[in-house]
From Swiss-Prot:
Belongs to the GrpE family. This is GrpE protein homolog, mitochondrial. Keywords: Chaperone, Mitochondrion, Transit peptide. Probable component of the PAM complex at least composed of a mitochondrial HSP70 protein, Roe1, TIM44, blp/TIM16 and TIM14. Residues 38-55 have a biased composition (Basic and acidic residues). The keyword Cytoplasm does not apply. Pfam families: GrpE (PF01025). Gene3D superfamilies: 3.90.20.20, Head domain of nucleotide exchange factor GrpE. PANTHER family: GRPE PROTEIN, GRPE PROTEIN HOMOLOG, MITOCHONDRIAL. InterPro entries: GrpE, GrpE_coiled_coil, GrpE_head. Residues 35-55 are annotated as: Disordered. The keyword Transit peptide applies. GO terms for biological process: protein import into mitochondrial matrix; protein refolding.
Length: 213
């Protein structure tokens, strides 16, 4: 083979060697790149796998803590409500004690008011104009009773005069029945003794007569 014919063959061989070297170099670079990219991914997956039980444990502990917190909050709210109810009951008891502590004393004073009322009713009205002393006595009794009733009112004690009202067993005590067609049945047609209430609580029922049914 001549030198001129061998020269192209040598050049082709050199190109082939260079090409193989280039391909091998690129493959190695790709392999290294693949290996480098794969390692962090594998490490992340491995780390996630290793931490999964711990995350599950923490999740369960968090759920348990939330449930316990909800229970404690519910107990706290119930305790506050119970305390508020107890405070209201105590305040009402104290208020009732202040208001109704004089109830028995008021009942005794009612007898005085009744006596004054009977005394004024007993005075003959037709003789007042001709008897100055009797008139002064009557006026004195009337003023005394009126003053006593004003004192009662200031302390929440008021009379019950249920004439022509519907009979109420909570405030009235029926002594007799009376025929009266001008009113509906069970209506108070006569009051023989006034009742009294202390701050809306009946402390003495009115003694009454009611119409027949």
């Amino acid at each position: 083979m001549s030198a001129k014919a061998a020269l192209p063959l040598q050049m082709f061989g050199r190109r082939l060697v260079h090409l193989r070297s280039s391909v091998t170099s690129q493959n190695m670079s790709a392999l290294r790149l693949y290996s480098t990219e794969k390692q962090p991914e594998e490490a992340t997956e491995q780390k996630a796998t290793e931490s999964s039980p711990e995350v599950e444990k923490l999740t369960k502990e968090l759920a348990a803590a939330k449930e316990q917190n909800a229970e404690l909050m519910d107990k706290y709210k119930r305790s506050l409500a119970d305390s508020e109810n107890m405070r209201n009951r105590l305040n009402k008891q104290i208020s009732d004690a202040k208001i109704f502590g004089i109830q028995s004393f008021c009942k005794d004073l009612l007898e005085v008011a009744d006596t004054l009322g009977h005394a004024t009713q007993a005075v003959p009205k037709d003789k007042l104009s001709g008897n100055a002393d009797l008139k002064n006595l009557y006026e004195g009794l009337t003023m005394t009773r009126a003053s006593l009733l004003q004192v009662f009112k200031r302390h929440g004690l008021e009379p019950l005069d249920p004439i022509n009202q519907k009979f109420d067993p909570n405030q009235h005590e029926a002594l007799f029945q009376k025929e009266d067609k001008t009113v509906e049945p069970n209506t108070v047609v006569e009051v023989t003794k006034l009742g009294y209430k202390l701050h809306e609580r009946c402390i003495r029922p009115a003694l009454v007569g009611v119409s027949k049914c």
